[in-house]
């Protein structure tokens, strides 16, 4: 009897062990309820938050335990992922590259080689917003003016710093305020700021609010400053802000950089594969596309590799397996 009991206990143990191994094996569907996925986004006034919230909602719907967290956006999200405070995070690809190569905002830190990408999202446009009558019609016109450059070490502020550098200027050439773009535009509404950097998708809600009672204008990124910027930081993409987006007089030349979804390297490959398979399903796309026009226009399987392929940013193994199964990777 004791021998039979011992054999029975051992059999149960082996079955449980085999089940665990099966769950971690590539291609096996994960037990979704066993995983808690925190999605790191950005300020509630920006675009990261509603789109990240849609990802969290969809994950909850299909059985994952999940939450969405408002943050300071890109740089904070990268640090939270690295410290284990989140499993998925929206971030601008330029800042991810800086973290991996330990320069810019990550100067002096160890290269963040454990960062992993899951998918490309939508382009972030550098929108240097002002109002008509401010006297700011070129980047150089911001000399000596009050400029909101983003919260310290945020993705917006990193872009502002690179823009100043490309135009042969530093923050010392202007009166800069380290404010989030929501705060900066509120200050502009009150006449306390002359221009503000807003790096986000087009149709930003805070700029739309400003345009309700002001004739907004954008500082162009063009000429020698643009040439130098693309030479220094080739991850930027030459772009423009269409006039119809905010009702400006004409299209404005600028640059953009892709947002991507980072994923913790501690998540098993089959979980990442499962998330991607579900996100790119008809139901997943319907939920995410409804969150914002930028999600509707840009987040789709055909753009999944954009902003990641050809850079130093590695994909998570589960993402590699998924894209290979779709014939998108060798």
Can you describe what each PLM-predicted range is?
Residues 21-23:
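Bacterial signal peptide processing site
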């Amino acid at each position: 009897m004791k021998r039979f009991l011992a054999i029975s206990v051992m059999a149960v143990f082996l079955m449980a062990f085999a089940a665990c191994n099966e769950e971690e094996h590539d291609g096996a569907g994960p037990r979704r309820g066993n995983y808690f996925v925190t999605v790191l986004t950005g300020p509630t006034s920006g675009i990261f938050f509603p789109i990240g919230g849609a990802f969290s909602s969809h994950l909850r719907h299909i059985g994952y335990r999940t939450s969405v967290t408002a943050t300071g956006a890109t740089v904070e999200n990268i640090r939270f992922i690295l410290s284990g405070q989140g499993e998925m995070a929206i971030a601008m690809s330029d800042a991810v590259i800086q973290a991996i190569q330990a320069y810019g905002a990550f100067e002096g830190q160890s290269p963040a080689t454990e960062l992993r990408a899951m998918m490309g999202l939508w382009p972030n446009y550098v929108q240097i917003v002002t109002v008509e009558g401010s006297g700011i019609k070129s980047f150089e016109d911001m000399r000596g003016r009050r400029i909101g450059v983003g919260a310290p070490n945020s993705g917006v502020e990193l872009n502002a710093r690179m823009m100043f550098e490309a135009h042969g200027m530093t923050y010392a050439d202007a009166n800069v305020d380290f404010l989030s773009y929501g705060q900066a535009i509120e200050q502009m509404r009150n006449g306390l700021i002359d221009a503000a950097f807003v790096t986000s998708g087009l149709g930003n809600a805070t700029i739309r609010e400003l345009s309700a009672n002001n004739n907004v204008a954008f500082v162009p990124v063009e000429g020698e400053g643009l040439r130098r910027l693309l030479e220094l930081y080739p991850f930027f993409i030459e772009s423009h802000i269409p006039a119809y987006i905010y009702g400006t007089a004409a299209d404005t030349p600028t640059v953009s950089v892709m947002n991507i979804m980072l994923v913790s390297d501690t998540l098993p490959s089959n979980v990442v594969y499962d998330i991607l398979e579900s996100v790119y399903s008809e139901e997943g796309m319907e939920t995410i596309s409804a969150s914002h026009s930028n999600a509707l226009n840009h987040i789709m399987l055909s753009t999944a590799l954009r902003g990641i392929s050809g850079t130093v940013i590695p994909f998570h193994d589960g993402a590699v397996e998924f894209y290979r199964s779709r014939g998108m990777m060798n």
